[in-house]
């Protein structure tokens, strides 16, 4: 709770070293973090936005230190993306009370996660392009034009995956 954003990677390193000696403690920490991420989606209070960004960054750092499996990370990313949408109707991401068309915070959360991914596994390499396409589709369902900060974040995120994996954005 009281950790500076700049020290998140250091805390992740400490937790990865602690895993050798206190597995149950580390697993409990990870489980609580996953619950906080989900609870943040349920509450959706903008006053906690920085905490939520820090939580997803911490989760990504834990993945980078191999404390979280790729499927857990991807499941969490899909949870963030799809939260509040039941998948029924003519559009997968129809605006609703939980995820309004002019709310771009989920884009910020997911960009934070994608930009901080440092470890690439074969499973992640196979499944990430589909997620990126799904994420891109989600951004198209938001009120356009996107705010400049959001556009910059998306451009940086997709540029990373164009350079690394050859991902090509839709027009």
What are the residue ranges of the model-derived segments?
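Alpha-helical interaction scaffolds
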Residues: 1-171
């Amino acid at each position: 709770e009281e950790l500076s954003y700049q020290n998140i990677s250091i805390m992740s390193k400490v937790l990865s070293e602690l895993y050798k000696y206190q597995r149950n403690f580390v697993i409990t920490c990870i489980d609580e973090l996953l619950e906080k991420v989900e609870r943040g989606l349920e509450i959706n209070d903008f006053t906690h936005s920085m905490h939520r960004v820090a939580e997803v960054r911490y989760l990504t750092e834990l993945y980078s230190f191999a404390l979280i499996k790729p499927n857990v990370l991807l499941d969490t990313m899909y949870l963030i993306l799809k939260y509040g949408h039941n998948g029924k109707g003519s559009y997968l991401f129809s605006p609703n009370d939980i995820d309004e068309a002019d709310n771009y915070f989920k884009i910020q959360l997911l960009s934070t996660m994608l930009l901080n991914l440092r470890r690439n596994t074969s499973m992640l390499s196979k499944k990430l392009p589909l997620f990126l396409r799904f994420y891109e589709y989600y951004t198209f369902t938001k009120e356009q034009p996107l705010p400049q900060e959001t556009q910059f974040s998306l451009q940086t995120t997709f540029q990373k995956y164009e350079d690394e994996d050859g991902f090509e954005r839709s027009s």
